[in-house]
Amino acid sequence: MTVWMRIRAALPWLVVGALASLVVIVALLPAAWVTPQFSRATGGHVNLVDPDGSLWHGSATLLLAPGSDRSASTLLPGRIEWRTAFWPLFTGRVQMRMRQTQAMPDAITINASLRGATVSAGAMAVPASLLVGLGTPFNTLDLQGDVRIGWSDWRLFGQDVFGQLTMTINDVSSRISIVKPLGSYRAVWQAQGANSTLDLSTLKGPLFLEGHGTFAGHASSFTGTARADDAQRENLAGLLNLLGHPIGPGTVSLTF
């Protein structure tokens, strides 16, 4: 057997060995390499901090911030934990199971490849005070209450995203209002490719919020109303003035 024939016979095994080494290297990347990707993708609003472990098996803490300035950020109690499956890496896919020890004990599955990514349906419960870290208007309102978030399967293909997320806030109160609770509310985010919509509705008052928003690329708009129950109109007058411009008795417009 000539040298070239030997090289030709060994080449497939060399390629397999190189690919296996690359997969192992990627899988053993430290968690500190993974976490900055979340910050860049969300403009600094959603961050994974205090990472531990690796891409293979690691954990981190969720931090919400108004942007690059983290001085007013908030932390979600508990840890986000993930495990990456080994064999899918050989087919060019990343398959990861992720859970949050306190807010989301039931794990979700993330599948990603060069063609796109999917996130399985899930749900989590967080305190409304966590939203303060997102900045205005949440830091001004300083909301208290229980937030429950549920979502369908989400699919990402290039710049197009498909899925639905529903957030329900029960018995909301605010430090700037003597009326407690203000009410319970539901917001539904529907992603439809390059466009998405947001619908806000009230489950119970005395503060009633309604609105609809559209988002397409860098363009976005939201219009709605905030209205006080007649019995609490006087007590809610100050909060209504902060939320929008008066358009009627005990009613203001919401425009963002």
Model regions: which residues?
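Transmembrane beta-strands of outer-membrane beta-barrel pores
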Residues: L64, Q100-Q102, D171-S173, K204, ...
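Extended amphipathic, helix-rich lipid-handling scaffolds
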Residues: R99-P105, A112-W154, A191-L198, R227-F256
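Alpha-helical transmembrane signal-anchor/signal-peptide segments
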Residues: A31-D50
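Short helix-loop boundary/capping segments
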Residues: D153, G158-A194
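Hydrophobic membrane-insertion alpha-helices, especially the h-region
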Residues: R8-P30
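N-terminal beta-strand/beta-hairpin edge segment
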Residues: V46-N139, S152
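Extended terminal
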Residues: M1-V16, T35-A41, S177-F256
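Amphipathic hydrophobic-ligand
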Residues: R70-W82, T101-A107, L134-W151, V179-R186, ...
